[in-house]
Amino acid sequence: MVVFASISGELPLDETQKAALLSFIEAGGGFIGIHSATDTFYSWPEYGELTGAYFREHPWTQEVRVTVEDATHPTTQMLPSTLTLTDEIYVFRSDVRARPNTQVLLALDASSVGAAGDFPLAWFTTYGAGRVLYNALGHFDALWREPFFRAHLLAAIRWTAGR
């Protein structure tokens, strides 16, 4: 299990380390990306394939409503159907929903920011035999103190580890 939480920029992984990470996940290892884990490794296209998207912008930092789109998944079963929270909201360079084998778990209720459009915030996919989960939330410390967020992340760790 590998977790990249709130990383950004071009990190100092050499080609051997990058290949080892992808091989680990392809062989059945788990990967979780949290918040700015999509704002890194822009020059490594396989990483974008792994996470499902690259960060484009964060136009909203405010109180928002988040909708649970898949309440049956082990990482969202404990969540109410709608969450109200304050965070920095990411928008991505590509359409996450268009990716094969990808299921959106959480999405922004666009009406809560006076916008139109589709804004996925958390999803899961596979990479080879590995399970991958990404959640764009988690910019502010206050969210990490919320029991629902910690429960969701703990369930994500268990799920990506295959438990």
Model region roles, listed by residue range:
Residues D39-L50:
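Glycine-rich, charge-decorated loop segments at or immediately adjacent to ligand/cofactor-binding or catalytic sites
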